[in-house]
From Swiss-Prot:
Documented EC number(s): 3.6.-.-
GO biological process annotation, one example: tRNA methylation
Upper classification of the organism: Bacteria, Pseudomonadati, Pseudomonadota, Gammaproteobacteria, Enterobacterales
Record text on cofactor binding: Binds 1 potassium ion per subunit.
Function text: Exhibits a very high intrinsic GTPase hydrolysis rate. Involved in the addition of a carboxymethylaminomethyl (cmnm) group at the wobble position (U34) of certain tRNAs, forming tRNA-cmnm(5)s(2)U34.
InterPro entries registered for this protein in UniProt: G_TrmE (IPR031168), GTP-bd (IPR006073), GTP-bd_TrmE_N (IPR018948), GTPase_MnmE (IPR004520), MnmE_dom2 (IPR027368), MnmE_helical (IPR025867), P-loop_NTPase (IPR027417), Small_GTP-bd (IPR005225)
Subunit structure: Homodimer. Heterotetramer of two MnmE and two MnmG subunits.
Residues that hold Mg(2+) according to the record: 230, 251
Compartments it resides in: Cytoplasm
Protein name: tRNA modification GTPase MnmE
Domain TrmE-type G: 216-377
EC supergroup of this enzyme: hydrolase
Binding annotation for (6S)-5-formyl-5,6,7,8-tetrahydrofolate: 23, 80, 120, 454
Amino acid sequence: MNTTDTIVAQATPPGRGGVGILRVSGPKAAQVAEVVLGKLPKPRYADYLPFRDVDGQILDQGIAIYFPGPNSFTGEDVLELQGHGGPVILDLLLKRILTLSGVRIANPGEFSERAFLNDKLDLAQAEAIADLIDASSEQAARSAMNSLQGAFSTQVHQMVEALTHLRIYVEAAIDFPDEEIDFLSDGKIEAKLDEVIVELERVRSQARQGSLLREGMKVVIAGRPNAGKSSLLNALAGREAAIVTDIAGTTRDVLREHIHIDGMPLHIIDTAGLREASDEVERIGIERAWQEIEQADRVLFMVDSTTTNAVEPVEIWPEFMARLPKSLPITVVRNKTDMTDEETSIAEVSGYSLIRLSARSGEGIDLLRDHLKETMGFSSNTEGGFLARRRHLQALNTAAEHLQQGHEQLVVARSGELLAEELRLAQQALSEITGEFTSDDLLGRIFSSFCIGK
C-alpha cells in the first residue's frame, strides 16, 4: 500500500439516498477542495458550497468539511463532501476528483488502515469499526462501541505493561545472580505472575462472551423424517420459516434462520430427514445435512417421542451416533410431548442433555433457549463488555499457555532464563491483538474485509 497517495471513496452505501458522502484523505485533500469547491473551507466548519466539474459547471451543492491532519480520523488531511445521494451525481463527482494527479480510489479498509498506521487507533479498535457496522443486535452494537472506545485494548495494554515490569524483574535476577536476595524464590515474582494469570483469565472470559456476540452459535437440527425438525425451526424463529406437513421427507434441502436469544446470535439450520434416500434430490439433501452436522457447534437430535420410549441416544439410533464426530456436542430433544404422557422437562442422561418439549404447541421451547445459552456459556448481562474475534481468542489462549509454562519454569525448574522467554512470548501474543506486533500479511487480511469507504 502506498500511503503517500491521496485516496478517495464513497463513505455511504451504494444506491439512491437522501445524502451521499465522498471522503478524501491524503496530502492533496486541500488541492481537491480548491479545485472542486473553489476554496479551502475553514477547518472543522461545515460550509455549504457548490461542487464543480472540470469546466466549472455545478455538479451538485452540499456540505464540505475539511479536517487538517493530524487532527482527523486518518491522521492525514481529510475532506468530506456531503451531497445528494444519487449514484450518477456521486459518480460524476468521484470522476472529477480522480482527474487530479496522485489521487486514486481507496482500497477496502484503507482509511481505517491509515488511521492505524498513524496511531489514531490500534488494531482492535480498527476491527471494532467493522464490527459496529456489521452488528446484528443492540447488544453487539454496544459492545462494538465499547471496543472502539478502547474497552478491550486498555485491558490488553495493562497486561502487556504488567508483563514488561515482570520481565524487568526477572531479567534483573538473571543479570545479578550474586545478590543476597534470591529473586526467583522470595515469592514476589510468583505473586506478580499469578496476578497476571488471574487477570488474563478474566479477560479471556469476557472475550469468549464477545466472540459469541459477534459470531454466534451454529445449531443444526437433525433426525429422522417427520420428527418435527421444521416445526422446531419455526418455533425458535417465531415464524413459519419452513413448510410443515405430516408427509415424511417434506424438507429436502438445508434451511437457515438467524435469530437472537437475549442478544446471542443463533444460526439455526434445519436439515432433511436422515434415512435411505428414495431419489437423487433427497440423496443430495441428506448429504448436505451431514455436511452441516459435521460443522455444527451443537446438534439438536430430534426424536419423535410417539415412536420410542428410549432416552439413551445410542439406543434411539446407534447408526446416527456412530457417524457423529466424537467431539460434537449433542442435545437429545424428545418432541411431541403434546401427544404423549411426558411432561416438558430437561435432564441429564449418560452425559447428554435431554429435553422434552412440543415444537407444535411451543411448550418447553423456553427450556431449550435457556439450555442453548447455558451450553455456550453466554450471559445476557454484558454491560461494559467488548466484541472479540477468533484471532483475539487465539492470541489470549496462546498468552495463557505461555504464562502457565512460565509458572512451571519458575516453581519447578527455578529457571529464570526459561521464565523470561515464556513471558516474552506471552507479551508478543497479547501485542498481536492491538497490532503492536503484527505481520503485514495479517494487516492486509484484516483491512481487506472492511467497506471501501472505511
